[in-house]
Every structure is written in C-alpha cells, then in structure tokens.
C-alpha cells in the first residue's frame, strides 16, 4: 500500500513539473520514488520480465525497437524519454507498475546496479566507447564492472546478447564459468 501511495505522489509531482514547464517530470518522479521507497525498483521489477539495454551508443534506438516489438503482445514499462540513470529506471517502472515486461535503457555506469535490482532475463550489451572518459574513467574499468555484475547473477535465468564487434563487450558478456554463445554481425 505504501508503495502505491509513493507512486501516486510521484506521478502527481511529475505532472506538476510538466505543468510548471520544469521538464518532462520523469527525473523528479524517479528521485521521489527512490527517496521515499528505496526498494521500489526491486519490488516493481519482481513481477516483470526485464530486458536491460546498455552501451555507449544506440541505447535509445535499440530499447525503442525492442519495446515496440514486445508491445504487440505485452504491456510494457519503458523509459522512452531516455532517462537512463537510477531515477529514470525507477520512474519507468513506477509509471506502469502493472506491466508484464520492462524494457529499460540503462547508462553504462548504472548497469551493474540495474542487474542487481531488477534481476533481468536479458541484458543487451551494445558497445563501450571512449567518448566520455571524464565520466566513465576507463573503458576497461566499466567492462570489468559489467562482467562482475553479470557473473554475480546466480539465477541462471540471465541471458546476454552482446555485440562481438567490441572486445570489451565480449569480455563483459562471458561468465568465466559458463561461456555463452554470442551473435556476430554478418559482413
């Protein structure tokens, strides 16, 4: 019951933000959810099939394609605005708490947290680029964090779809004890 009240207030806060011309309301709603229901992401993701998409480039396009394809059969929670940090994930899940599937674009640095909190069935890894080194530090560090998060998932339900064009992504995607097949683009 408490979570439902938090979600209603978050929606109202988002609507107020839009009405006042202070943005689209997604981030303020997500921050509100995380502040007043810190375990909301876990609770909202628990009854959903979750797909996470991450990489330096192509997250928004890929997540929109996946969401639209799945929308033909399922109700979808999706961060269609591109809000891919912690608050954006919370807001997307909170905006459609009864969705059957969550398709979530997540920032490269947020992916380990998102894997832990949402227990996804599928993680799509696109690429890791050096275009934001001021924020990402070093691509190898991000790749190691991805690999650790993927390896830490012991559910056996997690599948990883990874671009084999990027050696850092390949390294991230393969669990040391359990190599998985990867798809490679035909040339």
Language model segments and positions:
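Short, basic phosphate-binding NTP loop
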Residues: 1-52, 68, 72, 84-92
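Glycine-rich phosphate-binding P-loop
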Residues: 51-66
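Acidic, Mg2+-coordinating active-site environments of NTP-dependent enzymes
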Residues: 48, 125, 129-187
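Short, well-ordered alpha-helical microsegments
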Residues: 85-87, 110-112, 168
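Gly-rich Lys/Arg/Thr-decorated short loops/hinges at beta-loop-alpha junctions or inter-strand turns
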Residues: 65-72, 121-131
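Short coil/turn connectors at secondary-structure junctions
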Residues: 45-49, 73-74, 97-100, 119-122, ...
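Conserved nucleotide-sensing/catalytic segment adjacent to the nucleotide-binding pocket
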Residues: 90-127
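Conserved RecA-like helicase motor-core motifs
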Residues: 74-81
């Amino acid at each position: 019951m408490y979570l439902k009240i938090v979600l209603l207030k978050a929606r109202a806060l988002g609507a107020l933000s839009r009405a006042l011309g202070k943005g689209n309301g997604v981030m303020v709603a997500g921050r509100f959810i995380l502040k007043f229901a810190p375990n909301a992401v876990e609770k909202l993701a628990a009854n959903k099939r979750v797909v996470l998409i991450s990489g330096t480039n192509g997250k928004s396009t890929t997540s929109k394609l996946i969401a639209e394809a799945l929308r033909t059969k399922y109700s979808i929670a999706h961060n269609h605005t591109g809000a891919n940090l912690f608050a954006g994930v919370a807001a997307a899940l909170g905006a459609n708490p009864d969705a059957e599937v969550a398709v979530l674009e997540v920032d490269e640095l947020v992916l380990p947290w998102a894997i832990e909190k949402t227990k996804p069935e599928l993680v799509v890894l696109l690429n890791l680029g050096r275009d934001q080194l001021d924020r990402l530090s070093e691509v190898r560090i991000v790749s190691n964090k991805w690999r650790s998060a993927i390896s830490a998932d012991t559910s056996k339900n997690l599948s990883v779809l990874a671009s084999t064009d990027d050696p850092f992504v390949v390294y991230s995607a393969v669990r040391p004890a359990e190599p998985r097949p990867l798809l490679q683009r035909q040339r």
